[in-house]
Design a protein with these regions (language model features):
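Extended charged
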Residues: 1-10, 14, 24-27, 45-75, ...
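The −1 position to Zn-ligating cysteines in a subset of zinc-ribbon hairpins
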Residues: 17-18, 32, 77
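Compact nucleic-acid interaction/catalytic patches
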Residues: 39-45
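Histidine-centered catalytic micro-motifs used for acid/base chemistry in nuclease
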Residues: 32-38
């Protein structure tokens, strides 16, 4: 759904001009309108690229879930959160966020070094999204 400038401005303010997920401040430009329930965009193979032996997909502009493409299903999100969330449900996204520390520990020598020197301290706690805190009035 293409948002008008007014709708986009209102959506940005939905949670106090912050990302619905991590709570970072959203500038006027550069943030994403995230479909909370994914619309799942349809794509097809680009035959022009295929003729050159390249596999490339292109969006058709259609959705597998067109009913999810509505204003009430949009949250303001920073680009990193929206790109990590992809088409996950909220609970699957929460799970993905909770796995990040262990993934960093497994795959990043920089993370392990910083942790060993006390520069990073992993904390076991549930992932609570900004919009949940905002709606409960506990956001700070």
């Amino acid at each position: 759904m293409a948002l008008t400038k007014k709708q986009r401005a209102e959506l940005r303010m939905k949670f106090g001009s912050r990302c619905a997920y991590c709570g970072c401040e959203l500038s006027e430009k550069g943030w994403h309108a995230d479909h909370v329930e994914a619309v799942l965009r349809k794509s097809e193979q680009c035959m022009k690229a295929a003729a050159k032996g390249i596999f490339k997909l292109k969006a058709t502009g259609e959705f597998y879930r067109p009913g999810a493409d509505r204003l009430e299903n949009l949250f303001p999100a920073c680009a990193p959160c929206n790109l990590l969330k992809t088409s996950y449900s909220l609970e699957m996204f929460r799970k993905q966020v909770s796995l990040q520390v262990e993934r960093g520990r497994k795959s990043s020598m920089n993370f392990r070094t910083a942790e060993r020197f006390g520069l990073i301290e992993a904390v076991e706690k549930p992932v609570v999204f900004w919009f949940e805190q905002y709606q409960e009035g506990t956001a700070s």
